[in-house]
Amino acid sequence: MPEAIDASSIATNYYKLAHLCSVTYLIYTTNGATNDSTLLELELLIRHSHPKCLVTYYNKYLYYFQFNHVDEHVDLTKEYPQLQLKYSNQVSADLLANPPKVASDKDNHSTGNEYLAYACLSFLKAVKKLVLFNLSRNEAVQLFGNYAVVKEQGLSNFILHIDPILLPNGDLLISISEKCHLQLFDSSIVDISEIEAVDLNFVLYIIPSGIRCHLYDNVNVASNFTTDPPKNSEVLMQLIKYSTGFDLNQLNSLVWVKLVPNLQHLNNQTSKISKFIHPVDNKKFILWPWRLCLLQFGLSEKDTATSPHVLTCDPISLISDFIDFNISHHQQANITGQLNPNHQHNQSFNYSIPSALSTGMSSTGANENKGDLNMVGDIPGSVSDIFGIQSSDTNDFFNGPNFQPAQNPSDVKLDSQEPVKKNSDDEDVEMDDLFGDASEDEKAKTEVSTNELNEEKNFEDLFNDGLNQENQVDESDKVAKSIDEEVLKEESVKSEDLKEDKDLKMQPSSGTIPNTFIDIPKDQMTIPSLKNLKQTPQIYNDPGAPMPVIPTPIFPQFGINSTLPGSAQSVNPPTSAAATDNEANEGARSIFSPILFNPIIKSNIDTKYGKGGKFYVDKEVSAGPDIDSKRKTLRATSVSGFELPSRREDSIGIESITDDNDRRQVFEFPEEQGNERMKDEGHENHAAENDNIIKKMEELEEEDDNDDDDDDDDDDDENEDEDEESDEDDDLNLENNDMNMKRSPPLKLNTLNDPYVAQSNQAVVNFNDSNYNAKQILPNSYNASSMNTGGFSSPASLGFSSSRTNVPPKNDSPFGLNNLAREDRNGTTSPTGDNSDQPTKRQEQSDSPMVVDMEVEKKSTSKEAENTPSGMTTPNSRGSISESSNCLPLILRGVNVASIPTSFILNNVIVSNKISTISTNFDMDVDDETEWSDYELCKNNEMTVKLNNLDEFLKCLGPNLIFDMGLNKLQNSLEMKLSNNERDDEEYDNIEGKAPSRQFENKLCDIFPFCYKVNLNEFTTEAYVNELKGETTTIQDELDNQLSFLDDITNEDILNPKTQLKKLNSIEWDAIYSDSSSNEDNSKKYQGMVHNVGQSSLVNTLEDGTIFPLANDKARVLKHNDTIINLNSIGIKFWKYLNFSPLNGPKNFQLLLISEHDHNMLHHNYNIEFLNSLVYNYKECCFGNISKINLQSSDSRPDMEGIDNGLLMVHKKDEDQVYGNMYKQVNRKLNALVEMIKSDLINKTNKFEFDRPLLLLFINFDKSVNSLLQISKLIRNFKLFLSHHQLPLVEVFAHIIPWSLIIKQSGSQRRLKYLSNFRLSKLSMNLYNQCPNERTIGKPVKDPTKHLFTQLVKEPPSNLNFKFMNNGSNGNGKTTFNDDIFLHLAYERSIDKNWFSAAWSDPLGVVVSTKSWNCSPNLQKTNNKNVHSLESISDEIWTISTALFKKLNDEIIKRTSGLGGKKFLVLTRINSIIPDDELIHWKRLSMKHKDVSLIVLSVNKSPKLLFSGPIGPSQQEDKSNYDPNTNRTSTNMDNSSSTNAANPTCGVGATSNAPDFFKTFGSNNPSPNNNAGSMSISPSNNVGINFHSPQQFLNAPGNFLLPQDFVSSTGGSTNINANPHSNASQYNPDEIIHDPTEELTAVIPKAPLPSFNSPTRLGMKIGYLIKETGVSTHEDTKQYLVYEINLLSCSNYWNLNAIMKILLNQYKKLITLNDILCVGEIDGSITDDRAEKDSNIIPEMTPPLNYTASGLIPWHIAAVTKSLDYLIHIDVEE
């Protein structure tokens, strides 16, 4: 094995700031009554005035710390007379680092020891605040939450974790690491001037607190921004300056944004990640600088929609066929029109609505494209591609000289209608069904014919004479041409208006435009890509309903004067009561149902049905001033194509109630001081009128609530759930305003005094103006995306949705900062939630630190106070903003950044909140909709699942998420869409954090000049542990003191190294007070001594096992089906070549391959080819045999298709861009399969083998994120079908394979990839592991887990313990574990507390299991069995663990014929320490079950790229090993004897070569001679080749049977050093294959370092797994991956060093199980995407960083991480 690492050369992520011997701490309070906010403000002032002052507020006191070696200190009582010294004490660094739990009575200072525990925590907080403030002050970072953000490149920012640590020896360290995945962007990435056109697919966080906020108005987004600062802006900016060191006054034009803080996130709680962008009911808002906002963008699906079938179509032939049909059809139509002139009419109602196929999707209405053939460019991509039409070319073509525009819309009127006589021809009837009636006035019809003839002429010009055979012109063509000349002559005057008509095409056009359509006949549209669509609108044919007035249109008809759906004009009623009947009827028209449904019976029946249904609205319109006259009138039972509110009042805005002048009133944010506020003389009357209207609305709403109780049961339930998840405070319930006036919530924000201001005339900033001072009045702007950061509708446009919102908000806003902005303020609320009485006058606020040295604020505030009205909300104050605001909570309350999800996707947000428009998936089939709801399949890309059968669904989804061979990568299907296309290129999915950049290190060293990076050896020596404790003095130390006279004779540093350690610990220095004269000299002297001590202690670290390599694991396999052999785990990669057999016997099953059949693709036989290859490989690997399922449908069910040769093919239709319809087909066929299985059982045809499990093998062609969810639903439904048909004997398991693994697609061709033996064998291994164990038919499965094809080998005992010798343990606890049973349990709960996932495994792989639960707090109230509480989950976990312990105990009894040892459950919490609500259940269960002992660990989900070291000459030379053309050995044989003598004990698996883990090996090179590590049956000196060990067989040369290859016993290694390129080394029979990616080094620091997840709490012990990477940050350094394992709790049964060493060795085995269980990537080390595309590219031998990192994650940790990373994006619906 390689040599041991040099710990003194490896730099860690710790930086040493100081070495202290003693610290003095002082505790201050204020004079008189303690005011928390005063102390908080004083802390900010002191830190701003003295940046190097260690001060912090904690537990109602102000703590101030002083270093005793520093002479100059700040006297706080002199500078701040408000402070009063309460207590001071000087303590040693050891005592400050580890304070006693209970104060000693013998201590003279026992009265002050009660503060020592607080002083310990306060000291770390003070150091952290000092470091962060100085970094922020120097613009190195920006404060964010409880940490900071650092800018790497461009506009992206990453979280920077900075945690201080005080060691018992006096070392003051800071741990610095950068979080990789959470990416935040500066607010400047969004252009505010174009904010209305931007999809707001992001969430907002404010600096410095990190609190999530929502935009107040998400419809009129621009209205949220203003350049006018709030009245408390000076105080706010001053507070921000004091807290962050950043002065906002230096910015010229500061933009303010109106935000609603997320109160849930303020309490460190995370919103539901599956719908992370959600609306909030909270109306409390703040004005915050836009400069101090960070944005987190959501991930959306990549645009993967392709049309491969276009390549197989001939567009020329399609156009030719179209022209032929067009000519023949219109020849007949023109003759018919001339022979029957009386059937034509001049005026006709707009019956014909263009279909989705002819017009494309457009939400702007249907009439805008009438008479304009340019709408051909709007054809959907599937049609336009088929016809070869490009939009730009189309416009140029139809704008030619021969093209004529449609008739002027003003010439067409709709005053009268005439009956329509349809053509008797069948084709015309079909066209009428498709496009509506084709009857037109004579002029319009002639014009259409003219345009079409011109179109045909242009096509003839394009294709020359290709159509002459069928282009025969008859007399009708001559007549048409004469009419064409007349029309051209008449229309020549209007040529200038053509451009204006075209410009209006994309706008809502008038309803008077003549009715035309693209005359593509239905017969000609039945091409393969269109004939199966169901979007053709049909006339409503209900025999029991009245006759329809007009055919049901497919699109709403909007005129020029109407607006888009969702706007105020489309929702609000008419403003004039004198509207004509015509207008009333227009407003009452429905876009779907033209039927008038007015029930006569209105009594003796339930109100719900008496009104005509849930969507009934009164038709009567009164002319009086009553508010009902202003309501929108809808037809009874009408269904709108757009989302309508559930209540009538929801659609009424204030602009529909007040007059026009009131509606034009402008709402502005408060301007700067000195500006005049806009006033209206009739404002009081206007407000009073509004109050009267509000009262009427309340009365109407109460009546409506009484009437609609039954109608809105479902809506009420949804509202209750939303209220439970809402961020709205309990005190926002304004119905009980009087009762709540005296209550103070934890946080109250500003509330808009008039939240119902008309949104049509919002005052916004003209951001295009450079001075940012001008304002402009913008009309309604509803084109902002509803997918935004807050609610999905404007709070100002919600109308009067509830009676409680009509009451004016409360006045007691706690944000008044000591009454600086308001004089009549009473009371305040501290950030901690405690209420304290405050003086009511400014004269009594002299003790406020914000008043000290703030003359500017005094003057400005006094001027404002004169002109500022009372804070009491009155009708006269509508439109203003309450100016007093307590900004301390938003500045000082740092949110834990762990509550921010690393990513969130937008699938559920887009689908659930998108306006319900008609799409191409529109289907009139009611049964089809019922089918969707029954099967619970998603139509689009949403990630939703029903609550029913959720547990069964998770059982189907879990294995496909975890055991996926690393192929299902979520991030590959997602992308972050930014406005400037900025995104971090480095994406490391398997790396959680990394060391800070070199640029940041340079800034840190500039700010703290004497700090330095700590090397690893400083944590692994005894020099820094317990050196200052007096009780460590021994007899030897006393003897050394007596012999002190020898110092004059000899060098004591050489004779006694402890004297050097004492000198080292006596040196005090710090990097904080750099001005001190002694710091520079002491720091240099200290660092020099540290280097010397580290070099001398390197040998000690190797001897005591602090740093040791981990041995390669061995696996147990069967050879010749009867002999169990042990081999290195790398031999599993050559399973088929070595002819191994599974340890637990063969598993047989039957298979059904489910794949798609695309008739546009060539080479369809790849499915059967792959199936045959898999069946053959599975058999060749001795795993068993696979039978292909063959079932035929019975004669009584001809509708069911049989299954032949194990293939179930689903035909993909051309229009199936989304795979929803395909999943529906699979679901139907799986249901039919169950029926065929039951028929086979009844008929006893015995074609289905009930003694074999059934494998459903899916080839997944869907690239969307929800494809795994959809297929898991299919698997669940199949199991439900089996249960429904009472077929419990059928065992089912499923596996999903991405199509990219086995299929290569190029254009329209697909072929089977070359599948290596390695890949096929891996897939066979995976299927074997997932296949259920063999069982007797009819008996339940007894095994709680499935058998694996192999298991790892348990290490032999290092010594034999005999009971009579009693040497099994020492004084420090047990050190051996051979008889004990370890079961590892890893679990994690999502940060939104909705999902829970766990995985079990023993270190050898005997038992493995995984499971997930839904634990949503909101869904638990439904009492559904599929939702679990934390208590029930804990009980189930313990039950499963008990069953697994029993199986492990049975295995030990089977192997050793003896009883097992003690049971240890290694409880591992991922990404956090165990929270209190979880800890209480584990304590309860551990006390109940005494036979199981808990070992509690805390780990991270992935390693961090933290350590680095230099690249020496030897390492640089090792790079040649990566050259595939060389074949040299990786080590130097000359050093074998010397290094072995220097390192006699290297732990388990020690070899003759000293271990150096970080030397690189080529994967094709053999390892050095290793007699100790070879098999015991292999002789060390063997003449020739010996095949007793498979390891030797793997290294045998290909021509080993030739005579010249048999060499002497010394020929294997004699000439290696003489010629490094010699091939003589390959003849050594004892050489083994070695995989360098499996090499790990374990480090157990002796220093008590804290865990990353709990930086302020020391664990019992910490350990590291270290692995070298091929990535280097600089030319002279290389990087190391670090995986941290923190021991939180265990019994005193163990010695801490021994148990940590055991756990590190077991984690190495759990990492090896990654490959056996197919959890990690199967070929990440050898695959290069570029090499696959270009055969000339040689793949790099250095493995990718993601693959290297995955080799450092235990499989049970990776399983939990994979599960939760997907489950958190799934929304569970009731």
Swiss-Prot record:
The lineage of its organism: Eukaryota, Fungi, Dikarya, Ascomycota, Saccharomycotina. It comes from Debaryomyces hansenii (strain ATCC 36239 / CBS 767 / BCRC 21394 / JCM 1990 / NBRC 0083 / IGC 2968). Residues 1525-1543 have a biased composition (Low complexity). The gene is SSN2. One of its GO terms (cellular component) is mediator complex. GO terms for molecular function: transcription coactivator activity. The keyword Acetylation does not apply. It is found in: Nucleus. This is Mediator of RNA polymerase II transcription subunit 13. Its main location: nucleus. Component of the SRB8-11 complex. The SRB8-11 complex is a regulatory module of the Mediator complex which is itself involved in regulation of basal and activated RNA polymerase II-dependent transcription. The SRB8-11 complex may be involved in the transcriptional repression of a subset of genes regulated by Mediator. It may inhibit the association of the Mediator complex with RNA polymerase II to form the holoenzyme complex. Residues 394-451, 491-519, 565-584, 670-753, 797-883, 1507-1548 are annotated as: Disordered. GO terms for biological process: positive regulation of transcription by RNA polymerase II. Transmembrane segments: none annotated. Keywords: Activator, Coiled coil, Nucleus, Repressor, Transcription, Transcription regulation. The keyword Transcription regulation applies. Residues 394-410, 565-579, 827-838, 867-883 have a biased composition (Polar residues). Component of the SRB8-11 complex, which itself associates with the Mediator complex. It comes from the Eukaryota. Belongs to the Mediator complex subunit 13 family. Residues 425-440, 699-733 have a biased composition (Acidic residues). Residues 437-506 form a coiled coil.
